[in-house]
Design a protein with these regions (language model features):
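Secretory targeting and sorting signals
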Residues: 1-23
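A structural motif
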Residues: 24-315
Length: 315
């Protein structure tokens, strides 16, 4: 990984703050997308430290973690293999599991062999995808979601906690980007963006149960990520084709959503995870490949300014 120390923060978007509702994000046809999912992902270790994963434009894979809960970060370390898009989640026993698709769409995963411990080798899953997301269901089993190059949507889950996987099942609809998160009551919620930038979501009607149909959000995005606030409200994050950054949240846990609010700055990739104390942290990559993050300064609260990481990841 080329290491570049960046000291400037992203340019502020004039007149837009954390609490201001703005017009729904629109597509500006400014930047061509890669056709693959996010180049950046985050998950939380058993000991509460966040871990960040990313791939660069050469498909090399890197990760780094907080040195202490909510604290400073380690340096980047390389992982073997080559991936184009990535996702990560924590198993019920605290072991992180890391997923990715390579440039041919083949799907791989590896996992910590003990909580906060060493990593297994790569194992291939059948099928081909271009975008991938993962969440943990109410039973503690990971569920994997993805879209392929034709926009077809699939999912599969662990048969037992930390165990082998079911076969793929197809979900109706067509998406190019996917994100998933678990509601406070254990119901999974799936978010996605289609090739026109339209934004959709659907959710389990009961924990571990059947799914609703697709519901469309206003606005247009090219990337999407999700995390859960300390008070149980899901929050989604995304960027549009002009690299503007937006977010919105459930008004109350499991209820309808706020309007979109715009963050300052410009990103082309996003990922989000919740710190051990309940504060969401947002990670992103801009059009030059530079990596940034910001975090809630208190649970359910306002956001810090952007801070830069060293290194370059795929825009």
């Amino acid at each position: 990984m080329a290491v570049v120390t960046v000291v400037t923060v992203l340019a502020a978007a004039p007149g837009v703050g954390w609490s201001e509702a703005v017009a729904a994000p629109s597509s500006h046809s400014v930047r061509a997308t890669s056709g693959f999912g996010s180049s950046i992902a985050a998950a939380r270790n058993a000991d509460g430290r966040l871990e960040l994963f990313g791939v660069n434009s050469g498909d090399a894979i890197f990760h780094r973690s907080q040195n202490s809960i909510g604290g400073s970060w380690s340096n980047w370390a390389g992982l073997d293999g080559a991936l184009r898009a990535v996702a990560a989640e924590t198993n019920a026993d605290g072991r992180m599991e890391f997923f990715g698709v390579n440039g041919a769409g083949y799907i791989y995963h590896r996992w910590q062999t003990s909580p906060a411990g060493a990593w297994s080798g790569w194992e291939q899953l059948d099928g081909q995808l271009t975008s991938i997301a993962v969440a943990r269901n109410v039973h503690g089993r990971l569920e994997l979601f993805g879209a392929n190059s034709a926009g077809n949507i699939f999912h599969r889950s662990q048969i037992s906690i930390g165990g082998p996987w079911s076969g793929w099942d197809q979900i109706d609809g067509a998406l190019t980007q996917v994100a998933a998160e678990t509601n406070a009551d254990g119901r999974l919620e799936l978010f996605g963006v289609n090739s026109a930038g339209n934004i959709f979501h659907r959710y389990q009607t009961s924990p571990g149960g059947a799914w609703t149909g697709w519901v469309q959000f206003d606005g247009a995005l090219t990337t999407i990520a999700a995390a859960r606030n300390a008070d149980g409200r899901l929050e989604i994050f995304g960027t549009n084709s002009g690299d503007a950054v937006y977010h919105r949240s459930q008004n109350f846990s499991g209820t309808p959503w706020s309007g979109w609010a715009q963050f300052d700055g410009a990103l082309s990739q996003v990922a989000a995870e919740t710190n051990a104390d309940g504060r969401i942290e947002l990670f992103g990559v801009n059009g030059g490949g530079y990596v940034y993050h910001r975090w809630q300064t208190s649970v359910n609260g306002p956001w810090s300014d952007w801070a830069s990481f060293d290194g370059i990841l795929r825009p």
